[in-house]
Amino acid sequence: MASFSQVINPMTGQNTWQERGDDYDYHQEVANAGFGDMLHDWERNQKYYAALRKTIAAMRKAGKEVHALDIGTGTGILAMMALRAGADTVTACEAFMPMANCAARILAANDAAQVRLIRKRSTDIQMGIDMPHRANLLVAELLDTELIGEGAISIYNHAHQELLTDDALCIPARATCYAQVAQSPLATQWNSLKVLPSLDGDILLRPPAQLMECSGEAALHDVQLSQLPPNSFHTLTEPAQIFQFDFQRKQPREQQREHVLRLQLSKPGSVELVFYWWQIELDDAGEQLLSCAPYWAHPELQQLQKSFKDADRPLPNIVPWRDHWMQAIYYIPKPLQLHQAGEQFWLRCYHDEYSLWFDAHKEQPEQPARRHSCSCDLHLTYTRNRIGQLNQGTRNKRYLAYLEQAVQQAKPAHVLVIGDGCLLGLASSALGACSVRCLEPHRFSRRLLESVAKHNKLKNVRFLESLQQLEPEELNTLTHIFAEPYFLNAILPWDNFYFGTLLLQLQQQQKLSESVEISPCAARIYALPVQFLDLHKIRTPIISCEGFDLTLFDEMVQRSAKQALSQVEAQPLWEYPCRALAEPQLLLSVNFANFGVEQHNQGCLELTAKGNCNGVALWVDWQLAANNSSKSIVSTGPLEPIVPGQFVKWDMFVRQGVHFPSQTDDQTHLKWSTTLRPLLGELTFNFSLQASHEETK
């Protein structure tokens, strides 16, 4: 039986009803559960297995029976490892019911049906009912990028109190958290608003005081640190141990701690950021180490370099790849300017039950500090990517070049700015526009831009909650409609075609003069077949892991993905290196002066570079003016011309679209089609890889 769900269509801005099966939420949860790339993590799998074999062998040698408990078993992989390694009994628990049911089938298929599977959270297990006795070996994977964000502290505390013997061993046994202080003009663009200069270097907009004084959000910014361009940051200290977690300790792990470290600068600079990662010791002796460090700090980098066979793989990608455990950036609330190498400062590190945060001081702090939070609306309203966009110099220059020319030629210029948080449109007032109307329906975004306008004494700006607030005489005098475009509801780049929908609404209110200049005037969607080094693993079937058959898991995920995942998903591709396998292909062109026209296009693209096409990257180029100059193009895709066979350098402040083909071997052509129904807010893509003999069919 089907049901209807209300969803927002980002291209139309309307709430629409979509017919969905009763099990849609189930399929969506399965498809997005994220087990896949974890099971492709060969280092994790091998070291967990090695730690289990070693620990169980030592326990049996000591004359102990081994009763293992696997908390959050997922596919059952760790439970099966424990059983095969010689545990006398194995109990596994899994609260996510679709996964638990799948695990039961996987256990049976791998002759491991003797594993006791409990379909509960570990904290709901009742001794004597669900488990006959306590376990003396706990194996679990309860960690995330922050280490403790999935509730590891309380889960381990409960397990030791209720489910484990006093002498129980744990895999992993311990974890150590690391921090490295850094300076990065690039990374700080994701956190604070800079001044907006004109093309001549004069300041057009200054951030108001509340933005300059705001401490920002304490929350982590999780990224693949190894992919930061080496010239974009400087590490100012060596990595320092900040917290240790003993998972084997019977005594409860503290839910809140503060650690103050005295650190020394290796070079002068601004203490702006903390790079964070962790390392686990899987066995009691600490011989099986697994580090999430970026490549430059990875303890096994030299070993990995010697053993790695792919000479074409860049150094940052030699360390084991994983997307479920990344690194994180934390932003210092008030950066410290330190001018001499060897100068010392104090780094304050905090954690609560689920998260961490940091601060820095020139003098040793005496009073405890509260977790900082945003007080300026910027960090509450916009994503890290959006904040970075607002500061992106090259991008801003292209918009400002258009605006300067447009405002100077119009005289007087009356500008309607459409989009959320469009500081560039606001800057048209500072460039000399006679009047500026800014459509800002989001309350926090509008409040932020009002404060910027007030601080910069812009007198001719009016903010609108809706287009209906425009008076007929204002529409009659309009000379320009400008957008980046950017909207808060947008996920994929073409979701910002909502700009076209708003233009149609304006035309319905009152027919606009043909002399009104619209920017961007057009948009183009491009596709590029690529070979990812690693990103494809999030959607690639597992088949087998450490000798265990996981095809039942693959089938479950693939069934759910077909029903719940779109053909294209959003990813920040700068974090996931890929090689181009052809020149970019234009899929669709949109003219915003005539946005309501439906389109259907199709074609076939030859893969001209060697490689396995495991992904198709998509992006939008916005054309600001009708002059066809390359300087009028703002791209959300590659930053440099594409060279087939070479790595692609992607825009770091926007997410691109990605399609993952299901069949990737021995294919030479990419067949594609796309359909745009703008009035319905529908944009669909279809891709299929084909061998050369199929291409003409």
UniProtKB/Swiss-Prot annotation:
UniProt-recorded Gene Ontology molecular function terms: histone methyltransferase activity; protein-arginine omega-N symmetric methyltransferase activity
Enzyme Commission number: 2.1.1.-
Biological-process GO terms, alphabetical: peptidyl-arginine methylation
EC class: transferase
Record domain SAM-dependent MTase PRMT-type: where: 14-357, 366-697
InterPro entries, per the entry: Arg_MeTrfase, MeTrfase_PRMT7, PRMT_dom, SAM-dependent_MTases_sf
UniProt keyword Repeat, yes or no: yes
Keyword line: Methyltransferase, Repeat, S-adenosyl-L-methionine, Transferase
Pfam family, one: PRMT_C
Keyword Repressor appears in the UniProt entry: no
Record function comment: Essential arginine methyltransferase that can both catalyze the formation of omega-N monomethylarginine (MMA) and symmetrical dimethylarginine (sDMA). Specifically mediates the symmetrical dimethylation of arginine residues in the small nuclear ribonucleoproteins SmD1 and SmD3.
Annotated family: Belongs to the class I-like SAM-binding methyltransferase superfamily. Protein arginine N-methyltransferase family. PRMT7 subfamily.
Protein name from the UniProt record: Protein arginine N-methyltransferase 7
Gene name per UniProt: Art7
